[in-house]
Amino acid sequence: MLLSELKPNHDYAKEGKYLILSLRKKKGVRKDKFIEIPITWFDYNFGEKVEWLIVREYQPSVNGKEKYTNCKLENIHAQVSVVNVKGERMK
């Protein structure tokens, strides 16, 4: 599924789902090298020079603490996986 097809500012955890984004994390990493980040929520944040995606990471083992991260939209691969909390990938 494409990121543009998903609903921004929507809590996917309430539906028992999370998303897996592919993110180019560091400048020194090759342009075709991505890391996967599981998230439960995202929204767009448009700055003056850079478009950002603010995400809430999926961390099932953390004691009630939510981690929010800003990612440059240009560093996120357009293809996103939708996964049930049980670990089953969906279309």
Swiss-Prot record:
Domain of life: Bacteria
Record key words, sorted: Plasmid
UniProt-recorded name of the protein: Uncharacterized protein pXO2-06/BXB0005/GBAA_pXO2_0005
